[in-house]
């Protein structure tokens, strides 16, 4: 978990999906982000990339080749690398890996 802060807010970010985990008001300690109650929905603020929603039959065609892509894409389920962290900013990167290359394989 990585944290950045200002006089107003403190934000905690997970490397898993580069997902925000907490946004806390510095003045009163109030959590302003959904808490991720697992009985309802355990995620908080997932990065939906490269698509928001569901594709017809979970497929898309590019250059006459069909590919499979599940609802909301893949970024939210992969590990991001923290590239830069300062008091007021954090930069994460999703790097090519066997998992990302598998996503790009043609649907047969």
Each predicted region: which residue ranges?
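Surface-exposed acidic/polar loop and edge beta-strand patches at domain peripheries
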Residues: 1-105
């Amino acid at each position: 978990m990585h944290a950045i802060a200002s006089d107003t807010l403190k934000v905690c970010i997970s490397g898993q999906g580069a997902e925000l985990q907490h946004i806390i008001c510095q003045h009163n300690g109030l959590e302003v982000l959904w808490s991720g109650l697992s009985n309802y929905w355990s995620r908080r603020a997932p990065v939906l990339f490269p698509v928001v929603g569901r594709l017809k039959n979970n497929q898309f065609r590019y250059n006459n080749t069909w590919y499979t892509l599940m609802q909301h894409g893949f970024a939210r389920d992969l590990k991001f690398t923290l590239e830069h962290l300062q008091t007021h900013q954090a930069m994460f990167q999703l790097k090519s890996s066997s998992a990302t290359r598998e996503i790009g394989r043609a649907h047969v």
